[in-house]
């Protein structure tokens, strides 16, 4: 979710661009599922990054040492950080500043804004962040820091520096303690050993919890940590002032004597209101029903706690799962749930972390662009990925808006927002960008112009490629078990890029089909075979409908001959003739039948020209022996002469 600072800057600008399409600054949705609840023992940590319709994202790999030890990183809004060592290599998905001008802060100094998500060479994965909504009283008691760390900086710093999830947590908490936060956030930091969730609602307060293997938690910008006992320091880390700030604000809920605090009720603005629809729909998704509503959900139904019946227990939530063992398919479908999937989705990602696997294959990062219902999640093995598909790296140009309906709807769509309405015109060459292609398809599919039949077609075709990705991830993992070094990196990078290209190509083909009625034809198939008399026909059929196109095939050079008939009988004095007729054009060809041998009982000499037995054979053999004898004699004589 995008920083509030950025939103206010964008609103103040009032430019006639896609900024008019901003739907909400608080629409990211995070979810975690512990390994005890999954079908393969993986843990899942995931989030959608939501901000605006039509706001390009790019994905890339930052190479080891991009930031040298001692160099200073300057973020969008004044936060700086001095690197303690050469930065680790890591994957990232950032806002599009390819033009050299940051779309978030408008500055030109080198930085990678809103990298949001990635995994580094040490196996540390970060999803940063979900913006939270603090109550006004706690912010007054502990204000945000103007130069504090923001969403725009978090993933960059943590992935560059941290060699473990715990080290990443400690680094972030130290920044909160010393520099402070520029905005409230919820951050996931994990590796193969543990996954942590960190919340801060004010400038210097925070709570971090180590998520357990038998729980589900989610946070659609509401906050997720409820009643916690701060003495459980193995699993709960908090700022020294966490209780004190809430007391100063007059919002503290908990027990000082027991060192407990209900973070949600003490700090979150939602504590005094109703849960949003994304929480309701997300809880119902795991229940496989629609039984819950905003009016029936209490904070205790979804917040994280380590207190039960007055005692410290393992961290848990009361979120119920009726899906059975949860698979990657279930996690992808979570981001297709209404409202969780929305036009503000910029990208969404799922980390599938398997603690028992080798470090190279223990983490799979599933990355999808744009609207959850119209995109495909592509699997990557981030520690082996050295580059990203080119379609993720297209950028540098922004979409524009116009009040006039374009004559050709291709590459455009209508929008309506609080600030106005009009038409979006995608940037030149947008077909080369994976984000823009999904943006075009999803906006058309959600419009009144798209028929129910076309919508069903889109979902059906995308589902086929998504299934291919599930199958391919398993295939890649098995293949990588027998690879190492550069071979493994080349294979993993190439296979993931090929899947992304296939999904991108399909998305563009679907868009052209439903918008411009262009057909994508399959292979040529011979539907009428050519003959010696007539040309044949080959047909192509559209992948998405029954439309066909044909072409002629040249006449065949050959004939279809029958079994033939003897038209002249062979005799002892003359050859015979067998005649064949083409069954298509009636052409004929003749074949000689050898003359018959003479009768065996006649007085004529034998007819065999070269008998294999008898006197002639013996004479030939005798001649050969004599020839060899003479040759041998000559050889011996010559040899003797040479010796002399």
Segment roles from a protein language model:
Residues 516-604:
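Extracellular modular ligand-binding repeats in secreted and cell-surface proteins
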Residues 11-22:
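Bacterial N-terminal signal peptides
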Residues 604-621:
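Extracellular Ser/Thr-rich, low-complexity/disordered mucin-like segments
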Residues 297, 301-401:
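Long, well-ordered mid-to-C-terminal structural blocks that present hydrophobic/aromatic surfaces
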Residues 28-150, 171-301:
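A contiguous strand-loop segment
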Residues 628-644:
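C-terminal membrane-anchoring or membrane-association module
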Residues 2-11, 637:
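Bacterial N-terminal signal peptides that target proteins for export
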Residues 369-374, 382-516:
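Charged low-complexity "KEKE/polyampholyte" interaction tracts
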């Amino acid at each position: 979710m995008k920083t509030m600072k950025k939103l206010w800057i964008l609103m103040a600008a009032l430019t006639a661009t896609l900024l008019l399409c901003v739907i909400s600054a608080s629409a990211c949705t995070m979810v975690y599922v512990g390994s005890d609840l999954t079908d393969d023992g993986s843990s899942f940590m995931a989030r959608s990054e939501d901000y605006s319709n039509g706001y390009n994202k790019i994905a890339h790999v930052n190479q080891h040492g991009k930031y040298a030890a001692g160099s200073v990183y300057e973020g969008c809004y004044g936060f700086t950080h001095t690197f303690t060592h050469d930065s680790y290599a890591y994957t990232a998905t950032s806002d599009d500043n390819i033009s050299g001008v940051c779309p978030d802060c408008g500055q030109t100094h080198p930085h990678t804004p809103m990298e949001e998500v990635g995994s580094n060479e040490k196996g540390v994965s970060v999803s940063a962040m979900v913006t939270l909504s603090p109550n006004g009283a706690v912010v007054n008691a502990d204000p945000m820091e103007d130069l504090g760390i923001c969403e725009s900086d978090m993933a960059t710093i943590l992935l560059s520096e941290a060699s473990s999830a715990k080290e990443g947590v400690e680094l972030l908490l130290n920044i909160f303690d010393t520099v402070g936060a520029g905005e409230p956030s919820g951050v996931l930091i994990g590796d193969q050993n543990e996954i942590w969730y960190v919340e801060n609602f004010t400038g210097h307060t925070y709570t971090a919890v180590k998520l357990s293997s038998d729980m589900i938690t989610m946070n659609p910008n509401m906050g997720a940590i409820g009643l916690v006992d701060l003495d459980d320091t193995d699993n709960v880390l908090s700022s020294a002032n966490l209780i004190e700030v809430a007391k100063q604000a007059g919002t503290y809920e908990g027990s000082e004597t027991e060192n407990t605090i209900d973070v949600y009720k003490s700090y979150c603005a939602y504590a005094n209101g109703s849960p949003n629809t994304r929480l309701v729909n997300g809880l119902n998704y795991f229940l496989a029903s629609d039984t819950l509503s905003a009016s029936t959900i209490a904070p205790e139904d979804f917040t994280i706690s380590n207190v039960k019946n007055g005692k410290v227990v393992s961290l848990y939530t009361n979120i119920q799962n009726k899906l059975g063992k949860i698979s990657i398919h279930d996690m992808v479908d979570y981001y297709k749930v209404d409202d969780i999937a929305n036009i503000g989705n910029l990208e969404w990602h799922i980390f599938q972390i398997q603690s028992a696997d080798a470090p190279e294959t223990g983490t799979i990062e599933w990355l999808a662009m744009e609207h959850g219902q119209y995109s495909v999640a592509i699997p990557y093995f981030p520690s082996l990925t050295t580059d990203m598909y080119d379609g993720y790296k297209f950028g540098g140009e922004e979409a524009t808006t116009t009040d006039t309906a374009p004559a050709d709807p291709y590459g455009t769509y209508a929008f309506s927002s609080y600030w106005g309405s009009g038409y979006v015109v995608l940037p030149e060459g947008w077909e080369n960008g994976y984000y823009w292609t999904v943006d075009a398809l999803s906006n058309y599919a959600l419009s009144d112009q798209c028929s129910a039949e076309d919508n069903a077609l889109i979902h059906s075709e995308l589902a086929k490629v998504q299934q291919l990705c599930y199958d391919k991830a398993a295939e890649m993992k098995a293949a990588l078990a027998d690879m190492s070094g550069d071979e493994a990196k080349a294979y993993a990078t190439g296979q993931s890029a090929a899947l992304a290209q296939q999904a991108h190509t399909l998305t563009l083909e679907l868009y052209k089909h439903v918008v411009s009625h262009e057909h994508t034809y399959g292979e040529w198939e011979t539907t009428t075979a050519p003959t010696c008399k007539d040309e044949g026909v080959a047909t192509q059929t559209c992948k998405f409908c029954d439309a066909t196109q044909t072409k002629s095939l040249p006449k065949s050079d050959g004939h279809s001959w029958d079994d033939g008939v003897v038209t002249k009988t062979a005799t002892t004095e003359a050859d015979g003739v067998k005649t064949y007729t083409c069954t298509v054009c009636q052409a004929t060809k003749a074949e000689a039948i050898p003359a018959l041998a003479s009768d065996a009982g006649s007085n004529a000499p034998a007819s065999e020209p070269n008998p294999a037995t008898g006197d002639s054979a013996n004479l030939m053999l005798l001649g050969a022996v004599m020839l060899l004898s003479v040759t041998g004699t000559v050889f011996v004589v010559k040899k003797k002469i040479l010796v002399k």
